[in-house]
Amino acid sequence: MIIKQLPLTDLHRHLDGNIRIETILDLGQKFGLDLPAYDIEALRPHVQIVEAEPSLVAFLSKLDWGVAVLGDLDACRRVAYENVQDAMNAQIDYAELRFSPYYMAMKHNLPIAGVVEAVVDGVEAGCRDFGIKANLIGIMSRTFGQDACQQELDGLLTQKNKLVAIDLAGDELGQPGDLFVNHFKQVKDADLRVTVHAGEAAGAASMWQAINELGAVRIGHGVKAIEDPKLMEYLAKNNIGIESCLTSNIQTSTVASFESHPIKTFLEYGVKACLNTDDPAVEGIELPHEYEVAAPKVGLTPEQLKQIQINGLDLAFLSDSEKQALRDIAAKR
């Protein structure tokens, strides 16, 4: 269950994995695209998980129609704005919305820097209108290779003062982290923090590399840490957080069942893990589902869920004063 007197955070939430079906339909028709279906229920299986996919890459293909309809920068601005509204509707107090501008720009050859600016504008407008706090994390999509990631990083850094961190996401097996060491030197020089998708499709070695060579202070998913007790101890000792996404890990077949998800073991080791959605529109879930449906299936106790909610704020890329302000607001509810 969610404790209302504590801030509720979602730190691992892909903006480009949370494009409403209604918006896909609307923008698809606006730009004259050949969609696989032209009503919401017929379109749903093409853009939302119906049953577990065999792999991460198969899961990610469900995101493709969402970005395919981004025919201009106004469309990018719209989906960013709607993402903030969706977070508000899920009772989230603070969201870190991550996005890949290369992926969003690709279908219609949009300017990457323009996509970044449009997303920044949309999120800022959403925060003003909906009264929640949100920050942005820029993604480099490793799936498209080193050169594409450099283009993506260049675009992201044009708005570096509007971002809190940079992430590396996508095909972890085909494009390992050691190909992106130089990219993350630039991230460090820009004084941005680092979170990396690791230990999802690849093993614990991918997480060590993300921490030691890329500078990750948080890890997205990180389920394979369970294979390496020394890594578990290191995560706990050095306060490196795990952004856990329970339903996503089932739907990508990263974890075989809720019962076998390692988050409970992470908490028992003292690893700071928090609950997040990942790609809510694609998964057909929202953050309350993770606390109220997925977490009990994993076997998390009320005390562990409270700790998870506390961890979410502790791990947020916010100043101490910003965190305290969120605590003060929640305490009055």
Swiss-Prot record:
Pfam families xrefs: A_deaminase
NCBIfam families, per database record: aden_deam, PRK09358.1-1
Assigned protein family: Belongs to the metallo-dependent hydrolases superfamily. Adenosine and AMP deaminases family. Adenosine deaminase subfamily.
Gene: add
Catalytic activity field: adenosine + H2O + H(+) = inosine + NH4(+); 2'-deoxyadenosine + H2O + H(+) = 2'-deoxyinosine + NH4(+)
A single Gene Ontology CC term: cytosol
SUPFAM superfamilies registered for this protein in UniProt: Metallo-dependent hydrolases
An example Gene Ontology molecular-function term: zinc ion binding
Co-factor binding details: Binds 1 zinc ion per subunit.
Cofactor: Zn(2+)
GO biological process terms on file: adenosine catabolic process; hypoxanthine salvage; inosine biosynthetic process; nucleotide metabolic process; purine ribonucleoside monophosphate biosynthetic process
UniProt keyword annotation of Metal-binding present: yes
EC number(s) given by UniProt: 3.5.4.4
Disulfide bridges in this chain: none
Function: Catalyzes the hydrolytic deamination of adenosine and 2-deoxyadenosine.
HAMAP family assigned to the protein according to its UniProt record, in alphabetical order: A_deaminase
Protein name: Adenosine deaminase
Binding site for substrate: H14, D16, G170, D279
Active site: E200
Swiss-Prot/TrEMBL keywords: Hydrolase, Metal-binding, Nucleotide metabolism, Zinc
Site annotation Important for catalytic activity: residues: H221
Entry binding sites for Zn(2+): H12, H14, H197, D278
UniProt enzyme class: hydrolase
